[in-house]
């Protein structure tokens, strides 16, 4: 077949005229200089092709073979003519990756299939048997590779990519018109390559050559990108099946297909066929970015499905008690007094103050301690007053440090009662008060400040109070927290008696006293309520 009319092509944005017939004639003459190639089986098995003519580095001529399905081209043109598109055409695009230029040939008419004389007589170029369009599954796409003996023209082949296997895609491939080799056409030696290519390129449909003047009907024939992603997810076991998608989701996932987007996916499919050793850094970054965007889209899709299909769970809400003091204080006079004391407090905090105060009463303690063997109401209580008090300043500071270590051990140990914890904090604050009495101060110095400084340096030697960034150190904050807690428990013991530290049941956590009764006013109100109800 010959084309007599010249066609236009562009190089670097400039339109030039080219006699396509002369160009194809030159290809025929060029192809005639090549000896018949060996069979596919011999080339893949490596039994032939060892001569000088098959050496890719030799000075012999190189042949560019364009493999395409003529039936697919004719079927595409016939479908376009039936749709009323009388100007259906076929485009051939030659791209030079080295010079970063491309030549596009727009062929007005394609009358009948034709082959060159040399390619028709070559057994290696015999067409493969292809299944019908209805016989394949969209998720089982296989991309075949050319033989290792075939090579590209010198002027379009990069030096670093001589041994790269390039994919061959059928032109005008659509979801209803893809062509792949049958099982009997696949040689055993290349079966692993086809399986690897099938897994790597399942997301990229075979787009082939698309005319720059593609119509909207051509765009509608292209597969949906997100539908292809769902197929890959199902095959990898990481997503839902395509049947699980509702029609509304499929319509929502559709996007306007353009020529530029199809060409971009075609280039990505060709780059994905390259081996990691010969792939350029730019191509690797493109593939990584594409995979990251696909993973992000799939994760968002899975999150949306999980939110929509998540079963309803019962949320456990905290128990809210009614802050009614009448249920706790039956005596009217006591109730009026408690109302006056807690008028400025939160009602829920006032209710808990009264509830914990009633829990300390002797009858409540006797009932609560009946099941506890380690808390004896009438037993002796080891307190600082029963021990020999230190006299010197060094002894006091040493006792203070030992008490802090003891508190840390009690907090980490699995003890059954909080009695020892409370007693240790009272002893800690007693050491602190005794050191304030005997410390020697200079003019303008405060006993409280000097006592804290000496205790801190003894407890944490070499650790400054302020960090290099101007903030207080963790050790200084922990030291002040110990002093503050010791003051709270010492105040309770001094107002209500030392026995209160043992009579407090386990239902009253030490964290409630230390965290809820933060201010001095709140602590004294609770102490007065305990004294009133006792």
Curated annotation (Swiss-Prot):
Residues 34-61, 110-130, 236-287 are annotated as: Disordered. Hypothemycin is an antifungal agent that exhibits excellent activity against Peronophythora litchii, which could be helpful for the storage of harvest litchi fruit. Hypothemycin is a strong inhibitor of a subset of MAP kinases such as human ERK2. It can therefore be used as an anti-cancer drug thanks to its inhibitory activity of Ras-mediated cellular signals. It can also inhibit Trypanosoma brucei kinase TbCLK1 which is a good candidate as a therapeutic target for African trypanosomiasis. Finally, hypothemycin also has inhibitor activity of T cell activation. Residues 112-127, 258-275 have a biased composition (Low complexity). Pathway: Secondary metabolite biosynthesis. Part of the gene cluster that mediates the biosynthesis of hypothemycin, a resorcylic acid lactone (RAL) that irreversibly inhibits a subset of protein kinases with a conserved cysteine in the ATP binding site such as human ERK2. The first step is performed by both PKSs hmp3 and hmp8 and leads to the production of 7',8'-dehydrozearalenol (DHZ). The highly reducing PKS hpm8 synthesizes the reduced hexaketide (7S,11S,2E,8E)-7,11-dihydroxy-dodeca-2,8-dienoate, which is transferred downstream to the non-reducing PKS hpm3. This is Hypothemycin biosynthesis cluster protein hpm4.
């Amino acid at each position: 077949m010959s084309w007599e009319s010249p066609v236009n092509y562009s190089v670097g944005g400039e339109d030039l005229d080219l006699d396509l017939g002369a160009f194809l004639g030159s290809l025929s003459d060029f192809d005639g200089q090549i000896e018949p190639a060996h069979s596919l089986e011999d080339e893949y098995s490596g039994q032939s092709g060892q001569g000088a003519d098959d050496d890719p580095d030799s000075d012999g001529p190189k042949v560019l073979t364009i493999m395409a399905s003529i039936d697919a081209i004719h079927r595409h043109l016939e479908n376009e003519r039936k749709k009323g598109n009388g100007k259906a055409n076929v485009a051939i695009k030659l791209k030079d990756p080295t010079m970063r230029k491309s030549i596009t040939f727009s062929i007005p008419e394609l009358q009948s299939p034709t082959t060159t004389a040399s390619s028709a007589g070559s057994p290696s170029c015999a067409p493969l048997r292809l299944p019908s369009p209805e016989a394949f599954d969209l998720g089982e796409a296989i991309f075949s590779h050319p033989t290792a003996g075939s090579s590209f023209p010198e002027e379009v082949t990069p030096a670093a990519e001589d041994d790269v296997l390039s994919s061959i895609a059928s032109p005008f491939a659509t979801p209803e018109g893809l062509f792949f080799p049958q099982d009997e056409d696949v040689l055993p030696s290349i079966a692993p390559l086809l399986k690897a290519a099938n897994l790597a390129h399942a997301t990229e449909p075979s787009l082939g050559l698309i005319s720059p003047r593609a119509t909207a009907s051509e765009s509608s024939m292209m597969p949906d990108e997100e539908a292809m992603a769902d197929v890959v997810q199902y095959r990898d076991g990481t997503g839902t099946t395509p049947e699980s998608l509702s029609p509304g989701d499929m319509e929502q996932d559709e996007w306007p297909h353009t020529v530029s987007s199809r060409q971009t996916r075609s280039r990505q499919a060709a780059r994905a066929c390259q081996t990691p050793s010969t792939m350029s850094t730019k191509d690797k970054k493109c593939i990584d970015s594409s995979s990251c965007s696909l993973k992000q889209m799939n994760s968002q899709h899975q999150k949306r499905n999980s939110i929509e299909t998540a079963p309803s769970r019962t949320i456990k809400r905290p128990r809210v008690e009614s802050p009614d003091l009448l249920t706790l204080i039956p005596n009217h006079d006591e109730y009026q007094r408690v109302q006056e004391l807690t008028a400025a407090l939160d009602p829920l905090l006032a209710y808990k103050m009264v509830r914990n105060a009633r829990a300390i009463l002797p009858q409540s303690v006797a009932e609560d301690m009946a099941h506890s063997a380690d808390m004896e109401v009438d037993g002796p209580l080891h307190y600082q007053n029963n021990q020999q008090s230190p006299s010197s300043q060094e002894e006091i500071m040493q006792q203070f440090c030992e008490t802090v270590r003891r508190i840390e051990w009690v907090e980490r140990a699995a003890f059954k009662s909080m009695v020892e914890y409370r007693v240790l904090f009272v002893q800690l604050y007693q050491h602190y008060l005794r050191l304030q009495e005997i410390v020697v101060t200079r003019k303008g110095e405060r006993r409280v400040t000097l006592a804290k400084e000496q205790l801190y340096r003894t407890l944490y030697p070499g650790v400054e109070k302020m960090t290099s960034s101007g903030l207080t150190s963790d050790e200084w904050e922990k030291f002040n927290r110990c002093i503050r807690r010791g003051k709270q428990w010492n105040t309770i013991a001094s107002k209500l008696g030392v026995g209160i530290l043992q009579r407090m049941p386990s239902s009253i956590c030490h964290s409630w006293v230390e965290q809820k009764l933060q201010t001095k006013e709140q602590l004294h109100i609770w102490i007065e309520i305990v004294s009133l109800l006792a």
